Structure formats: C-alpha cells, structure tokens
Amino acid sequence: MSSFDDRKKSFENKYANDQELQFKIKGHRNKYFGEWAADKLGKKDQEIENYIDEVIKADLKKPGDMDLVVKVQQDFKASNSNISEDEIKSKLDEFFEKAKVDFQ
C-alpha cells in the first residue's frame, strides 16, 4: 500500500470518528435540552424521561435542528408557556457546548 493510500485511509478514519463523536454530542445535547424543556413544561418523574425520549426521537425525523425547535415550540405553546424561538435555539447552542465538554 502506498503512502497516499495510507494517508487516504487515515483521513477516512478520522472523518468517521468525527462523525460518530458529533452524533454522540448531539445525543447528549438533546438529553439536556429535553430535560430543560420538560422542566419548563412542569413535567414530573417518569413524564420527564418520556419527554426526553420524545425530544430525542424528534431530532431523528429530519436533518438539522428545526424539528427539535418546532416540536418544543409547539409543546410550549400548547401549555401556554411564553418561551421564544430565539430562547429555544439559544438553549440548543448552550447544551451543545455543555455536551462537547462531556466528551473532552
């Protein structure tokens, strides 16, 4: 195998590892985000765990974060919570940074 092939394989492995790490970080972010939203919605005990699962599943529907934003925004609206889309997006960013620290 040539050094070019070795280098190519190394880059492919790094890319795969980076993608796996991003997936794990987003999973942790979604858990933190789900806990925050559940608290704001007044969920208790098992309702919190169930809601976290709903949030995690919502993120798997479409690429990007808008599916999470829409889901939580609709839930807040249904419960008459006054939390803006900007605050929701800000929390996603905050929890992403927190989750990154978990993997350092």
Show which residues each predicted segment covers:
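A charge-rich, low-complexity, intrinsically flexible signal that marks solvent-exposed coils, linkers
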Residues: M1-Q104
